[in-house]
Amino acid sequence: MYKGSIEMSTPMLYAMAFIGLFTIGGLTGLFVAALGLDIHIHDTYFVIAHFHYVMVGGMVTAYLGGLHFWWPKITGRMYPEAPAKLAALITFIGFNLTFFPQFLLGYLGMPRRYWAYPPEFQVLNVLSTAGASVLAVGFLLPLLYFAWSLKYGEIAGDNPWQATGLEWETSSPPPTHNFHEIPIVTKDPYAYGEDQEVPVVH
């Protein structure tokens, strides 16, 4: 992305969130893998936070980015961009508010799978619970605007992202077998910014 021409569309916001969250999940895996430290944090909330930064912060966030990217091609309709960006932001904030306090709880010695805990853990547990509520809103919003877009969304067009891949040269949604005849590719699939010529000849 450095020195690139980046458009902060909803899929890009989810992609950037994926990079950040998955990086935190990966780096905290080093702590879990270090024997001396793992003796202290094993079976604590630190492990819970690490797991969720990898699996939810990584995989689910990437899935949401991909879903937003492909939605126009799948349905032929655009979703409203403003609520989608808001949902991406709410998801990112809610996720970190839910799971980052769990790193601290685990480091301070709170074991997982316990429903009762000493009073000193109360504030961080309340923060984590509040974050889960925010995260739930972030996950529910796409269901609403995706459903809305199926009927009221703007017509997407064949290539709403100005992408250069072959899949964006067919209609949205694509017909059976994508193309009626085999297309002839006339330019590189990653030739962004060179010209505005059509990359295939039908």
Model regions: which residues?
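Juxtamembrane membrane-water interface segments of multi-pass membrane proteins
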Residues: 1-14, 31-47, 62-88, 101-123, ...
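Hydrophobic alpha-helical membrane-insertion segments
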Residues: 18-23, 87-100
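Acidic/histidine-rich
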Residues: 23-29
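Membrane-interface loop-to-helix entry segments
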Residues: 49-57
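Divalent metal-coordination and catalytic microenvironments
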Residues: 52, 93, 103, 143
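Hydrophobic alpha-helical transmembrane segments
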Residues: 59-67, 136-139
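Extramembrane terminal tails and long inter-domain/linker segments of multi-pass membrane proteins
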Residues: 111-120, 149-202
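Contiguous transmembrane helix-bundle modules in multi-pass membrane proteins
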Residues: 118, 122-135
